UniProtKB/Swiss-Prot annotation:
S-adenosyl-L-methionine binds at residues 7, 11, 50, 171. It comes from the Viruses. It catalyses: a 2'-deoxyadenosine in DNA + S-adenosyl-L-methionine = an N(6)-methyl-2'-deoxyadenosine in DNA + S-adenosyl-L-homocysteine + H(+). Keywords: DNA replication, DNA-binding, Host-virus interaction, Inhibition of host innate immune response by virus, Methyltransferase, Restriction-modification system evasion by virus, S-adenosyl-L-methionine, Transferase, Viral immunoevasion. Signal peptide: none annotated. May prevent degradation of viral DNA by the host restriction-modification antiviral defense system. GO terms for biological process: DNA replication; DNA restriction-modification system; methylation; mismatch repair; symbiont-mediated evasion of host restriction-modification system; symbiont-mediated suppression of host innate immune response. Changing residue 126 to S: In damh; hypermethylating mutant. Pfam families: MethyltransfD12. Monomer. This is DNA adenine methylase. It comes from Enterobacteria phage T2. One of its GO terms (molecular function) is S-adenosyl-L-methionine binding.
Length: 259
C-alpha cells in the first residue's frame, strides 16, 4: 500500500480499512491525491488530482524516469545525510529551472521529506540530514508499476469535472489540525467542499471523505453537523510520522464519511 513519496497524513496504513467501503465505479477520482498512497493502490482508471502543480508535474516526469536517473542526480550533486551545502545548491538549481526530477531528489533530502513550495513556486524546505534509503527505490518501483492507470491533473477541487459512474475519494487538508499542508485551508474552503459533496450525492454519485471530527481538544463542529446526513465510520490510526513530534497518542477522532 505504498505511496510514491513519504507524505504527511498519507493513508497507506488506513487503506485496508477504507477499501471495503469503496463502491464499484467506472473511474476512481482522487480529489486531493497528495503522495498517491490511495491512487496507486486502487483499481483503475484513476484521476489523481492535486492543486499543488509542482508535485503533479513531478509525477508526470517520473513516468519517463529510471531509478538510475535519480541516482545520477544524487551523484552529480554529491548528496548525503551531511551534505547541507550540496542540498542548498540543488535547491537553488530547482528554483531556477523548475526541473521536476530535481524536486523529486530534493524531497529525499529535505526536512521530514516535506515538499514545501512558497507563493513564488520556490522549494523552501530546509536540509533534513537525510538521503535515500531502501524504501525510496521500493516506492519508486511501486509508482512505476502502477502509474499507467492514472491520469494526473492539478486543478482546484471545484474545477474537476466529475462524471456519472465516478467514485470520488476526498482526503482534504484538515481544518482543525496543525500540519504544514493545512495552513491554506479555511472554513470557506471546507464549506465549498461539503457543498460539492452534497451536489454529488444529489446526482447519485458516490463519494468517500477522510477527515477528523476531533483533534487534541479541537472539534470540527461544521463537519460533525454535516456528517449526520451520511454514513460515518470511526477509524483507529497511528500517524506515519508527526513533524511536531507530539507525544499525545489519543484525542484524534479520524473518520471516513460516505454516502
Amino acid at each position: 500500500m505504498l505511496g510514491a513519496i513519504a507524505y504527511t497524513g498519507n493513508k497507506q496504513s488506513l487503506l485496508p480499512e477504507l477499501k471495503p467501503h469503496f463502491p464499484k465505479y467506472d473511474r476512481f477520482v482522487d480529489l486531493f491525491c497528495g503522495g498517491l498512497s490511495v491512487s496507486l493502490n486502487v483499481n483503475g482508471p484513476v484521476l489523481a488530482n492535486d492543486i499543488q502543480e509542482p508535485i503533479i508535474e513531478m509525477y508526470k516526469r517520473l513516468i519517463n524516469v529510471s531509478w538510475d536517473d535519480v541516482l545520477k542526480v544524487i551523484k552529480q550533486y554529491k548528496l548525503s545525510k551531511t551534505s547541507k551545502e550540496e542540498f542548498l545548491k540543488l535547491r537553488e538549481d530547482y528554483n531556477k529551472t523548475r526541473d521536476p526530477l530535481l524536486l523529486y531528489v530534493l524531497h529525499f533530502h529535505g526536512f521530514s521529506n516535506m515538499i514545501r513550495i512558497n507563493d513564488k513556486g520556490n522549494f523552501t524546505t530546509p536540509f533534513g540530514k537525510r538521503t535515500i534509503n531502501k524504501n525510496s527505490e521500493k516506492r519508486f518501483n511501486h509508482f512505476k508499476q502502477n502509474c499507467d492507470k492514472i491520469i494526473f491533473s492539478s486543478l482546484h477541487f471545484k474545477d474537476v469535472k466529475i462524471l456519472d459512474g465516478d467514485f470520488v475519494y476526498v482526503d482534504p487538508p484538515y481544518l482543525i489540525t496543525v500540519a504544514d499542508y493545512n495552513k491554506f485551508w479555511s472554513e470557506e474552503e471546507e464549506k465549498d467542499l461539503l457543498n460539492l459533496l452534497d451536489s454529488l450525492n444529489d446526482r447519485g454519485i458516490k463519494f468517500g471523505l477522510s477527515n477528523v471530527l476531533e483533534h487534541h481538544g479541537k472539534e470540527n463542529t461544521l463537519l460533525k453537523e454535516w456528517s449526520k446526513k451520511y454514513n460515518v465510520k470511526h477509524l483507529n490510526k497511528k500517524y506515519v510520522f508527526n513533524i511536531y513530534h507530539s507525544k499525545e497518542k489519543n484525542g484524534t477522532d479520524e473518520v471516513y464519511i460516505f454516502n
